[in-house]
């Protein structure tokens, strides 16, 4: 029988774009300490993945944004943890970013710069996928 500890953990994140820049946070704690990732975290009971993505964006970066379509569902399986992460798209957020208590840093980075960073799993792939959303001229096609 599978124990509760062996079940996947549902999480949500948001790929926030501003032209040729992407918002990344440097993780301030495990898992992935020191790696650069999208703002995100575990989904709380009774919360949708979209609500969790918005909450995590506010907690980790101090900003808000209109969350758009889901880019995809990504899995990260490490030695002792299995995450299923719903990743959403957002662009042109409101506010000035400021790293929250569980982020070591938060910043806008040019897409061409992120390859030199220690990235969390799937980040480069999701950034590449997000490019297609930037070419859509009508925001209502991308944002709900």
Q: How should these model regions be labeled?
A:
Residues 9-11, 17, 38, 65, ...:
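Short connector loops at helix/strand junctions that flank enzyme active sites
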Residues 74-97, 107:
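Active-site-adjacent beta-strand/loop module that shapes the phosphate/pyrophosphate-binding cleft
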Residues 19-21, 28, 91-96, 111-113:
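Short loop segments at secondary-structure junctions
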Residues 1-22, 73:
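Conserved N-terminal beta-strand and adjoining loop/helix that marks the start
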Residues 33-36, 101-144:
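Nudix hydrolase/Nudix homology domain
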Residues 21, 29, 43, 75:
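Short, glycine/serine-rich, charged loops/turns that create anion-binding
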Residues 38-70, 88:
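The catalytic Nudix box helix
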């Amino acid at each position: 029988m599978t124990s509760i500890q062996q079940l996947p953990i549902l999480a949500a994140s948001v790929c926030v774009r501003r032209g040729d820049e992407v918002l990344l946070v440097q993780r301030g704690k495990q898992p992935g300490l020191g790696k650069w990732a999208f703002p995100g975290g575990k989904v709380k009971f009774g919360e949708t993945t979209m609500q969790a993505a918005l909450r995590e964006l506010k907690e980790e970066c101090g900003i808000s944004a209109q969350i758009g379509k889901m880019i995809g569902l990504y899995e990260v399986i490490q030695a002792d943890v299995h995450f299923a992460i719903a990743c959403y798209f957002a662009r042109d957020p409101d506010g000035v970013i400021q790293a929250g208590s569980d982020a070591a840093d938060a910043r806008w980075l040019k897409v061409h710069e992120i390859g030199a960073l220690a990235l969390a799993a799937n980040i480069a792939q999701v950034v590449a996928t997000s490019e297609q959303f930037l070419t859509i001229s009508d925001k209502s096609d991308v944002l709900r």
